[in-house]
């Protein structure tokens, strides 16, 4: 098994130049050529930012609705009450509730990919924060998932909203589509993501903002991208 995996990776590495830095357009084409799995692999972009997340004013976090979606069917849970529950259901939310939903989560129910809540329900959400937080599901105003405009938030989530946040080392990883997408759609998704991240550059960040960038598939090696080209995207 290990030998078979090694041979597959060796074959993939032979298709790209390890020391080559690709422009956006060429990079998308190169990473698509690495598709080898028997399923529709996810295309992911990885960015190393010149920020220090230990400082609150250098935490880069946000959300973007990709123009062509991620190719993944997203299940959405909503914490709301009264008329806001109806708005959530009409917008297509998969799970809607309040205290009852919190109890279900405590009992192990995590069959959703994104959680949205109205501000007045955050005390209820807080009861399951230790469960949702580590899974990256905790609603946050910066990603538009704590809002009174429930219908818009659910629609965005279903349309391909991607939430992102730098990790402790200043990295952001985000899906930008499936390998089956046409190159142009993957490129447009990536440009929209990078444009949003560039807008969020902290004033206190010094030096080069995007230090390294790469594209990869679920089962492929990565392709290096021109970080300067990405920083120039406005």
From Swiss-Prot:
UniProt keywords, alphabetically: Repressor, Ribonucleoprotein, Ribosomal protein, RNA-binding, rRNA-binding, Translation regulation, tRNA-binding
One example of a Gene Ontology biological process annotation: regulation of translation
Single GO MF descriptor: rRNA binding
CC per GO annotation: cytosolic large ribosomal subunit
Any Pfam family the entry gives: Ribosomal_L1
Family annotation (InterPro entries): Ribosom_uL1_bac-type (IPR005878), Ribosomal_uL1 (IPR002143), Ribosomal_uL1-like (IPR023674), Ribosomal_uL1/biogenesis (IPR028364), Ribosomal_uL1_3-a/b-sand (IPR016095), Ribosomal_uL1_CS (IPR023673)
Purpose of the protein: Binds directly to 23S rRNA. The L1 stalk is quite mobile in the ribosome, and is involved in E site tRNA release. Protein L1 is also a translational repressor protein, it controls the translation of the L11 operon by binding to its mRNA.
UniProt subunit comment: Part of the 50S ribosomal subunit.
HAMAP family to which the protein is assigned, alphabetical: Ribosomal_uL1_B
Similarity-based family: Belongs to the universal ribosomal protein uL1 family.
Record's protein name: Large ribosomal subunit protein uL1
Organism this protein belongs to: Helicobacter acinonychis (strain Sheeba)
């Amino acid at each position: 098994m290990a030998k078979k995996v090694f041979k597959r990776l060796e074959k993939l590495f032979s298709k790209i130049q390890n020391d080559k830095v690709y422009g956006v357009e060429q990079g998308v084409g190169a990473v698509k050529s690495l598709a080898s799995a028997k399923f529709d692999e996810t295309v992911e972009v990885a960015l190393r930012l010149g920020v220090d997340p230990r400082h609150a004013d250098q935490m880069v976090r946000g959300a973007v609705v990709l123009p062509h979606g991620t190719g993944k069917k997203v299940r959405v849970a909503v914490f709301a009450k009264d008329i806001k529950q109806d708005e959530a259901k009409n917008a297509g939310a998969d799970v809607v509730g309040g205290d009852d939903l919190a109890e279900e989560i405590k009992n192990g129910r995590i069959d959703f990919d994104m959680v949205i809540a109205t501000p007045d329900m955050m005390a209820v959400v807080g009861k399951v924060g230790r469960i949702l937080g580590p899974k990256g599901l905790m609603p946050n105003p910066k990603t538009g998932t704590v809002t009174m405009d429930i219908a818009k938030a659910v629609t965005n989530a279903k349309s391909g909203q991607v939430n992102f946040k730098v990790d402790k080392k200043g990295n952001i990883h985000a899906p930008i589509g499936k390998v089956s997408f046409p190159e142009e759609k993957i490129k447009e998704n990536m440009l929209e993501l990078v444009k949003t991240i560039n807008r969020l550059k902290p004033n206190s960040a010094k030096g080069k903002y995007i230090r390294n960038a790469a594209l990869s598939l679920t089962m492929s090696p990565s392709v290096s991208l021109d970080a300067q080209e990405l920083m120039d995207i406005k």
